[in-house]
Amino acid sequence: MFDLDEWIATVRKCKYLPEHQLKRLCEMVKVILMEESNIQPVRTPVTVCGDIHGQFYDLLELFRVGGELPSTNYIFMGDFVDRGYFSLETFTLFMLLKARYPDKITLLRGNHESRQITQVYGFYDECQTKYGNANVWKYCCQVFDFLTLAAVIDNKILCVHGGLSPEVRTLDQIRILARAQEIPHEGSFCDLMWSDPEDIESWTVSPRGAGWLFGSKVTTEFSQINDLTLIARAHQLVQEGYKYHFADKNLVTVWSAPNYCYRCGNVASVMKVDESLEPEFRIFSAVADEDRTVPPSRKRSEYFI
């Protein structure tokens, strides 16, 4: 037998699990995620978080600021891995919390929860370094394929990693997508992971090479069609931790990786939503250098891309 609480205690010390335990954990979490819909319904009160990017010690600070599970209910909007030093430990902790408290934490897919992206931006190399092979990376990528695409809070606030798609007018069109796959290079699934808001009216090509830039008019139309009061997303660094877009303030970016890449100097935030559906933002900074460890083989510039 295994003890999830014991595994959580181990990983919270920024240690990673043996390969056979990690494989078992991935199998458990896949079964849980398979039962979730593409748009997972969540009830208030809930705390919504943006990108983490392997900044493990800052994730522990997030839980200190936002509240610990299971007393606090969470939605994390993807990008758990890459760029930070501890993607493995970060994603392992998320999986452990999902296995231990499946109804208290909702994990959305981000554009970095992908085989192609993680081979470029750090997670693949980190798994190779820590385990001496790519097996654990493969197990985690299989979990990525089952992460849900979005969440909706009290049927009124949509949470998604990137943004909107010109191919999606209704939430039902998201609900019928086949999500158990690598993120496609184009199309609605791709757009949900990659798109960004911009000060335009409609749609234009994204400089990222995937997804779209979308404007105020299409955001308002999408919100009206689907009876939404707010769209929350992550995907873009915000120096102040969060940012409302457009005159209607019907879209907000939440960013939860402070001092991103250990050099950007930004603060981070979490968005607390109670029954009133009025968001309250809690701002936090990166933990002090003396309260974190840095892998001896890592220079800071390696993951800043």
Swiss-Prot record:
EC numbers: 3.1.3.16
Which keywords label this protein?
Cell cycle, Cell division, Cell shape, Hydrolase, Manganese, Metal-binding, Mitosis, Nucleus, Protein phosphatase
Please state where this protein is localized: Nucleus
> What residues does Mn(2+) 2 bind to?
D79, N111, H161, H235
Instruction: Give the enzyme's main class according to its UniProt record, as a single word.
Output: hydrolase
Which of this chain's residues are annotated to bind Mn(2+) 1? D51, H53, D79
Any single GO CC term annotated in Swiss-Prot or TrEMBL for this entry: protein serine/threonine phosphatase complex
Please write the reaction equations for the catalytic activity of this protein: O-phospho-L-seryl-[protein] + H2O = L-seryl-[protein] + phosphate; O-phospho-L-threonyl-[protein] + H2O = L-threonyl-[protein] + phosphate
GO biological process terms, semicolon-separated: cell division; G1/S transition of mitotic cell cycle; negative regulation of isopentenyl diphosphate biosynthetic process, mevalonate pathway; regulation of cell shape; regulation of TORC1 signaling
Q: Which residues form the active site?
A: H112 (proton donor)
Q: How is the cofactor bound?
A: Binds 2 manganese ions per subunit.
InterPro entries according to UniProt: Calcineurin-like_PHP_ApaH, Metallo-depent_PP-like, PPA2-like, Ser/Thr-sp_prot-phosphatase
The record's annotation in Pfam families points to: Metallophos
| CC cofactor | Mn(2+)
Molecular function GO labels = metal ion binding; phosphoprotein phosphatase activity; protein serine/threonine phosphatase activity
* PANTHER family according to UniProt: SERINE/THREONINE-PROTEIN PHOSPHATASE PP2A-RELATED (PTHR45619)
Briefly state the protein's biological role.
Has a role in chromosome segregation. May provide a dynamic connection between kinetochore microtubules and kinetochore chromatin. Negatively regulates mis12.
Annotated family: Belongs to the PPP phosphatase family. PP-6 (PP-V) subfamily.
From the Swiss-Prot or TrEMBL record, give the protein name.
Answer: Serine/threonine-protein phosphatase ppe1
Q: Which organism is it from?
A: Schizosaccharomyces pombe (strain 972 / ATCC 24843)
**What gene does this protein come from?**
ppe1
